[in-house]
From Swiss-Prot:
Protein name from the UniProt record: Ectonucleoside triphosphate diphosphohydrolase 2
Domain of life: Eukaryota
Transmembrane segments: 5-25, 463-483
Calcium is among the record's keywords: yes
Cytoplasmic face of the membrane: 1-4, 484-495
Class of the enzyme per the UniProt entry, highest EC level: hydrolase
Cofactor(s) the record lists: Ca(2+); Mg(2+)
Induction: By FSH in Sertoli cells but not in peritubular cells; by cAMP in both type of cells.
Record Pfam families: GDA1_CD39
Enzyme Commission number(s): 3.6.1.-
Function text: In the nervous system, could hydrolyze ATP and other nucleotides to regulate purinergic neurotransmission. Hydrolyzes ADP only to a marginal extent.
GO MF term list: ADP phosphatase activity; ATP binding; ATP hydrolysis activity; GDP phosphatase activity; identical protein binding; nucleoside diphosphate phosphatase activity; ribonucleoside triphosphate phosphatase activity; UDP phosphatase activity
């Protein structure tokens, strides 16, 4: 008798497993879509010296999640920034054609119409808009005319404020490094315990510093409140116009012409012909323009590899004696103490990369950065060319930019040896260029929600059907086994 009962256990277990599985499959659920195709977005970063195009991509059903938007491709527009075409605005639009044609190839044809296309102009256009608003409008109109000829979903060309540029760069860096939220190994969205990191951007016409702070701002214009993924962030940000790489070089050139008649930041043995109109036509150098000014005059200027005089020239760029607040960075601008980790990108990265890779010098501390800068500034033109044969573009300017970066960080932003150790100089994060462009697109396409994304589990339809068949087979197999056991028990030879 006991043997008969034991023989019924396997089919009964199979039947129980099958019935349990069927019951679970019949529990009301929500439909889950199949893995979606990718969606795309395009941002044209119209900087002061050049324009760059970035194509981003993300899964089409993840519009309110994170950690999923990445860079698909990029393209550098040939020629100068769009503000350089003020005298012939049509060329501003024409300059974008090569990169837009690349975008047509990079984005699948069936996604063209649904791909948002943005153009954001930064510090190069801000002063231009103040001095020549009509010319600015003509340039933006010409650019818009070109962009609307393409099958993308063009959503406008606008001039970003300095605050926008700083905040969007901060959002980009922290988004890519998953400092807001990340998908954990437990299969759900979690908020990382690490805090956000500050962002420092050195463009062609301006520089930005942005970081989260607990200190209330004494200047409301430098404080931004953000709500991302259910978390509130108080962010300090400031953009210094005319403190970008290209404008700093122009201002130093104007000072060298006025004070020395030689350039202490240029390497000895390097000389060039300087057209005065090109020096003083910028809004950033108008204040240095001599009264007796002949724009068509050409002046010959030579370098002297003098680190000491170069430092003195750069120090004139910073006014640290006047501060109407309890604490300032420079030029009377309020700034709370820097705190936490920072990422420095754009010209910050390229300059420090030159010091470490080409010059072979360490820059892990402020003191090392100062020493590396001084060594670079004391190099002759022949010595510099020997390090990078065939490269002459920008080679003579690394001393001046490195000197500016050191003084900006130490005297301007007040980094000390301890806080400087928390600064990393980086070009990309998660294979995506760090800059304001991604943060700008994330904001305009609502890809970052204000509240934490919810979690929903589901099963693909094909998997559901397979499980249904499996559990049905289990029940049928159990029934067959039960029938065989019953027949076996009823047979005349059964004990």
């Amino acid at each position: 008798m006991a043997g008969k009962l034991v023989s019924l256990v396997p089919p009964l277990l199979l039947a129980a497993a099958g019935l349990t599985g069927l019951l679970l499959l019949c529990v009301p659920t929500q439909d889950v879509r199949e893995p979606p195709a990718l969606k795309y977005g395009i941002v044209l970063d119209a900087g002061s010296s050049h324009t760059s195009m970035f194509v981003y991509k993300w899964p089409a059903d993840k519009e309110n999640d994170t950690g999923i938007v990445g860079q698909h491709s990029s393209c550098d527009v040939q020629g100068g920034g769009i503000s350089s075409y003020a005298n012939d605005p049509s060329k501003a639009g024409q300059s974008l054609v090569r990169c837009l044609e690349q975008a047509l190839r990079d984005v699948p044809r069936d996604r063209h119409a649904s791909t948002p296309l943005y153009l954001g102009a930064t510090a190069g256009m801000r002063p231009f808009n103040l001095t020549s608003p009509e010319a600015t409008a003509r340039v933006l109109e010409a650019v818009t005319q070109t962009l609307t000829q393409y099958p993308f979903d063009f959503r406008g060309a606008r001039i970003l404020s300095g605050q926008d540029e700083g905040v969007f760069g901060w959002v980009t860096a922290n988004y890519l490094l998953e400092n807001f939220i990340k998908y954990g190994w437990v299969g759900r969205w979690i908020r990382p315990r690490k805090g956000t990191l500050g962002a420092m951007d050195l463009g062609g016409a301006s520089t930005q510093i942005t970081f989260e702070t607990t200190s209330p701002s004494e200047d409301p214009g430098n404080e931004v409140h953000l709500r991302l993924y259910g978390q509130h962030y108080r962010v300090y940000t400031h953009s210094f116009l005319c403190y970008g790489r290209d404008q700093i070089l122009l201002r130093l050139l104007a000072s060298a012409l006025q004070i020395h008649r030689f350039h202490p930041c240029w390497p000895k043995g390097y000389s060039t012909q300087v057209l005065l109109q090109e020096v003083y036509q910028s809004p950033c150098t108008m204040g240095q323009r001599p009264r007796a000014f002949n724009g068509s005059a050409i002046v010959s200027l030579s370098g002297t590899s003098n680190a000491t005089l170069c430092r003195d020239l750069v120090s004139r760029l910073f006014n640290i004696s006047s501060c109407p607040f309890s604490q300032c960075s420079f030029n009377g601008v309020f700034q709370p103490p820097v705190a936490g980790n920072f990422i420095a990108f754009s010209a910050f990265y390229y300059t420090v990369d030159f010091l470490t890779t080409v010059m072979g010098l360490p820059v892990g501390t402020l003191k090392q950065l100062e020493e590396a800068t001084e060594i670079t500034c004391n190099q002759t033109w022949t010595e510099l060319q020997a390090r990078v044969p065939g490269q002459k573009t920008r080679l003579a300017d690394y001393c001046a930019v490195a000197m500016f970066i050191h003084q900006l960080l130490s005297r301007g932003y007040h980094f000390d040896e301890r806080s400087f150790r928390e600064v990393v100089f980086q070009k990309k994060a998660a294979d995506t260029a760090v800059g304001w462009a991604l943060g700008y697109m994330l904001n305009l396409t609502n890809l970052i929600p204000a509240d934490l994304p919810g979690l929903r589990k589901g099963t693909h339809f094909s998997s559901w059907v397979a499980l249904l068949l499996l559990f049905t087979v289990l029940i049928l197999a159990a029934l067959v086994l039960l029938l065989r056991q019953v027949r076996s028990a009823k047979s005349p030879g059964a004990l």
